[in-house]
């Protein structure tokens, strides 16, 4: 059986609103931290979302 290569992560808003998205990524192919521009509905703007650990 194959190992589960994908790990669940949390993308947290850099605007400090507390809003976050959850997603998964392959740790083997992308070991660096993920940073994406996504929509923050709290402030109604696109902001940078940075990867944090999902607890």
Swiss-Prot record:
This protein's superkingdom?
Bacteria
InterPro entries the record matches: Ribosomal_bL33, Ribosomal_bL33_CS, Ribosomal_bL33_sf, Ribosomal_zn-bd
Q: Give the Polar residues compositional bias ranges.
A: 14-24
Q: Record's HAMAP family? A: Ribosomal_bL33 (MF_00294)
One of the record's GO molecular function terms: structural constituent of ribosome
Query: Per its record, how is this protein called by name?
Result: Large ribosomal subunit protein bL33
- Which family does the similarity line name? Belongs to the bacterial ribosomal protein bL33 family.
Q: Where is this region: Disordered?
A: 1-29
Q: Residue ranges under compositional bias (Basic and acidic residues)?
A: 1-11
Q: Which UniProt keywords apply?
A: Ribonucleoprotein, Ribosomal protein
- Gene3D superfamilies, per this entry? Ribosomal protein L33
The chain's disulfide connectivity reads none
One Gene Ontology biological process: translation
Name any GO cellular component annotation: cytosolic large ribosomal subunit
UniProt cross-references to Pfam families, sorted A to Z: Ribosomal_L33
Query: Transport as a keyword?
Result: no
